Amino acid sequence: MRLKKRFKKFFISRKEYEKIEEILDIGLAKAMEETKDDELLTYDEIKELLGDK
C-alpha cells in the first residue's frame, strides 16, 4: 500500500530561515535550562505512575 504524501511546497528567504532557526534555538536552550535538574524516569517507573503494573 502506498501512502500519499501531502506536503505543500513553499519558499522562504534566507533571512526568514535564520530568524526561525534563532527562535528554535532559543526555545531549545530554555527547555534544556528548565529540565537540567530533572531526574530521568525508567520505563517501569513511568508504567507505575500511569497505574500499569
Curated annotation (Swiss-Prot):
Keywords: Toxin-antitoxin system. The keyword Transmembrane helix does not apply. InterPro entries: RelB-like. Forms heterodimers with RelE and possibly a heterotetramer RelE3-RelB3(2)-RelE3 from 2 heterodimers. The heterotetramer is probably not very stable in solution. Antitoxin component of a type II toxin-antitoxin (TA) system. Probably neutralizes the toxic activity of cognate toxin RelE. This is Antitoxin RelB3. It comes from Methanocaldococcus jannaschii (strain ATCC 43067 / DSM 2661 / JAL-1 / JCM 10045 / NBRC 100440) (Methanococcus jannaschii). The gene is relB3.
